[in-house]
Every structure is written in C-alpha cells, then in structure tokens.
Amino acid sequence: MDSSALGLTCLAAAIGMAIAAAGCGIGQGMGLKAACEGTARNPEAGGKIMVTLILGLAFVESLAIYALVVNLILLFANPFMG
C-alpha cells in the first residue's frame, strides 16, 4: 500500500468519525434537552419520556457505530487499494 494512500485513508477515516461523533453529540444533546423540558412540564409522564429517550438515544448512537464500522473497513480492508 502506498504511504500517501494510507495517509489519505487515515485522514478520511478520522474526519468521517469526527463528523459522526459530532452529529451524535448534537443529536443526543437535543434529545436530552427535550426530555428534560417534557418531564418538567408534565412530571407524571416522566416514565414514558424516559423510555422514549433511551430508545431514541440508542438510534442516534447507532450512527456512530456505523461510522466506526465503515472506518475500520477503510483502515484494515480497504477495497480501493490493490
């Protein structure tokens, strides 16, 4: 594998993971903010809100896991390299 191609692959993997992690962080923060506001407005619905929040956070976190899998494929089994 060419060293410049390896360097560009590592750079692409790092940028991709950074974007995915930033998106997940923003999404989780917005979800938590909405859950806190909902619980503050209606404390009796706290249990339902918590279940929905946990499910939503799991879906948001799956984006980072998918990005990690793609980055690992790029780094260790790069289909673009000969």
UniProtKB/Swiss-Prot annotation:
It holds the Pfam family ATP-synt_C. It is a multi-pass membrane protein. It is found in: Cell inner membrane. One of its GO terms (molecular function) is lipid binding. This is ATP synthase subunit c. Belongs to the ATPase C chain family. The chain crosses the membrane at residues 6-26, 49-69. SUPFAM superfamilies: F1F0 ATP synthase subunit C (SSF81333). Its main location: membrane.
